[in-house]
Amino acid sequence: MNYKISVIVATYNSGDFLNEFLDSIKSQSLGFEDIEVIFVDDASTDSCTLDLLHDFNKKYSNVSAVFLDENSGFPGTGRNRGLDLAGGEYVIFADHDDSYVENAFEVMYDKINENDMLISNFNQVFDDKVVKFK
């Protein structure tokens, strides 16, 4: 399958966030079927993360999970492994606690196709208050 976007997520003991993260990807107006999600787990020790990743891998053909044997302690290790596997036209590095508005990927995809480079911004949410990044 040729995906428009590959989303690479390095995880470690992040089970509490994974459903919400994947829900925000599934709701993308670009179309979930055009998005590849690659989770690379950095040897999590909690069963919640491992169970969810195995479930996602079975349930969705465009979601894969890779499990590292040893904890590297560095998200770049998982991201680099994900890059080796990514088949999308473009790549997004995401964190397990990220959440995206419904048109985020569509806007980014359209903009990158209109320009040579795309640099995006983000907002941080703490205690239900949005803190804009400057």
What do the PLM-derived regions correspond to, one by one?
Residues 1-134:
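Nucleotide-sugar donor-binding/catalytic module of glycosyltransferases
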